[in-house]
Amino acid sequence: MDNNVLTAVPLFLFMGYLVERAGIVSRLFFAIRLALHGLPASMAVAALVTCALFSTATGIIGAVVTLMGLLAWPAMVKAGYDKKFASGVICSGGCLGILIPPSIMLIVYAVIAQLSPLRLFAAAIFPGLMLAGLYIIYVIIRAYLNPSLAPKPPSEEIPPRAVILKEVLVSFVPLFSLIILVLG
């Protein structure tokens, strides 16, 4: 294989490693959780959004599921979420890594099928985001219909809006800058 496109695979893995080691993912998860505290299953929605965003930095399922399993699952169970529900949210969110560009699977498929990776990325972005949106809608409806699956956080745990806004900006800017630099 003398295709230069495959050199992107270890670079995406390295980028995911750097994002994780910098603590961007954990900050992003907790910032989104705070920002969405009024929604049913806000922590599950935050986990899904974080999975979708982190998958753009890694491009692989295993890294997303492992990291979010270590980060979000204990927090969700501690908050009183159903263990099966929390596990399903993390596993389904991790699977978004195949569809949301830049996906290593799309890169490998582009090489094998002799297609343009950029065209595959363009073709996969809408289905990936649509699937993420459908997961989020499902989780919210499921938690609304059965509140014991995902209890709302106590109101005393919610900081002032200025603190939430600052945390969201500080956690989103580095990751979005990286995504824009990579995808162009």
Where do the model's predicted regions map?
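Alpha-helical transmembrane segments of multi-pass membrane transport proteins
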Residues: 1-184
